[in-house]
């Protein structure tokens, strides 16, 4: 797992796309020879991985949306992004 700071600015790298699979009615991350099906929360996080929002900003936005504590959300966001970064689905 990759350690992530609050000020890291995640983005989806070249060659990876966030896309809606209309056949399965699911959001997916598409990469060369790989596909990752996303749940609603993962999709909400990845939409904000635009190269502008930092991890703290993403966590704050999601805390507002889901009416949860920012610190709790940030822990989950960091864990998810760390796993995705280790698999090269996001860059920091």
Task: Give the ranges of each region predicted by the language model.
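Acidic, low-complexity/disordered tracts enriched in E/D and polar residues
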Residues: 1-47
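Long, charge-rich, low-complexity alpha-helical segments
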Residues: 34-92
